[in-house]
């Protein structure tokens, strides 16, 4: 998106649903991502055209719901999980961001409350994958253009991010050959076959 927006980082890109979906499609189909093990797509909150378009374009995708402990954030995240399931996507789990922080003196600071991630996970029936503490190192790493897990691996958030990566690799995203054998994969391939047959019939 930076290439599209140009050098003016404060300029708004005012696109409607069709243009957004076309842009997402170009990112997925035309960008040379290289030899990837996983492609993580950070989506905006809510249930917008982008989420619905991705659900259609990536039918064998797992969804990870991110929330803060705040009640309002949980409600938005719960709607995102519901939309994912209505799109026949698997909700793999919940990540709590901006969670409680353990101070050097051992006290705990919970700027946005506690337990919200676990409450959301329980309410939608999925595991809590991680609770990422509110940590200055995350901001410093982001401003430096380097992930906190690499720039500050021993920081509280850096440790949790590395543990979360292990969880995702081991438990969340199955190898592609397993995903293709799942019911969701079978339905996706069947849908592709039907669409191909429909297009061939229209050209005859």
List PLM regions with ranges.
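Flexible phosphate-sensing "switch/lid" loops adjacent to ATP/NTP-binding sites
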Residues: 1-40, 45-58, 78, 160-191, ...
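Conserved catalytic-core segment of NTP-binding enzymes
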Residues: 26, 30-33, 37-144
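Short coil/turn segments at secondary-structure junctions
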Residues: 8-11, 64, 148, 152
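The feature captures the short pre-catalytic strand/loop hairpin that immediately precedes
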Residues: 1-3, 7, 139-146
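Hydrophobic alpha-helical scaffolding
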Residues: 14, 67, 107, 151-154
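C-terminal boundary of histidine-terminating zinc-finger modules
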Residues: 144-159
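Short, conserved glycine- and acidic-residue-centered signature motifs
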Residues: 17, 73, 157
């Amino acid at each position: 998106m930076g290439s599209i927006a140009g050098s003016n980082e404060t300029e708004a890109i005012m696109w409607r649903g069709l243009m957004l979906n076309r842009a997402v499609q170009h990112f997925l189909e035309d960008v040379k991502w290289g030899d990837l093990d996983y492609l993580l797509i950070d989506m905006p909150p809510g249930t917008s055209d982008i989420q619905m378009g991705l659900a259609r374009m990536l039918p064998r995708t797992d969804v990870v719901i991110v929330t803060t402990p705040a009640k309002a954030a949980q409600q938005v995240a719960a709607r995102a999980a519901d939309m994912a399931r209505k799109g026949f996507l698997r909700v793999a789990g919940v990540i709590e961001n901006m969670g409680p922080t353990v101070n050097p003196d051992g006290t705990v600071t919970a700027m946005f409350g506690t337990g919200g991630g676990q409450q959301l996970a329980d309410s939608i029936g999925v595991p809590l994958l991680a609770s990422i503490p509110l940590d200055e190192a995350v901001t410093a790493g982001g401003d430096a253009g380097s992930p906190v897990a690499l720039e500050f691996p021993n920081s509280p958030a850096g440790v949790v991010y590395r543990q979360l990566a292990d969880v995702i690799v081991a438990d969340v995203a199955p190898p592609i050959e397993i995903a293709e054998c799942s019911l969701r994969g079978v339905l996706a391939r069947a849908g592709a076959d039907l669409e191909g047959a429909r297009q061939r019939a229209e050209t005859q």
